[in-house]
């Protein structure tokens, strides 16, 4: 039922049955404060995300450790603005602040190294061996990994003598994790989150409500939180924004939503 309702609101359809389903997931401020610590708050405002994460991190007694992203330019002729724009498009932090005991979320898929985008865990150790740094993370599934920095490459396809080749313009190295207490809806795209609270205050972009709700892996551990002084159903309907062209596309085409299919599996 959850995935069926998600599919419908993605197309801009809403009726009393769908509204009743999502209203049953609503929690108030008191209920939010009583939730387990392993829930992730998803909201649209970066300032609120930072405030939540900073507050939770400050309550840990272990020392603060900072990791600065390392940027490597392959050519001095590369436009600095272009590089910075590219780095901002990556789901990493320029300065990553962590403590032992902090709950973190992985921001990329790296199946070979044993983690995926949206998976979570607790930091158990930070170790330094020669010129390498490792972060020991106990994942929620009980498996511990020693995380190394992830290297992202800025590439362009170029042609030389009728041959195409990939030219690396720059690279950036950073641990592909963030604090998992709160994340913006925008930065959560592609993630699959086990225990999720969707703060739907200040939803303002087309499709943003769908993106937030569809991050949930398990509808049984999905909560919806908002603080507006209006009826939940009226507010939910008011933020279900979509493009008419999107609805027409779904009406005229048959397709599989691979993201929802993967979550169901």
Task: Go through each PLM region and give its residues.
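Conserved helicase motor core of P-loop NTPases
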Residues: 1-113
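C-terminal accessory regions
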Residues: 100-265
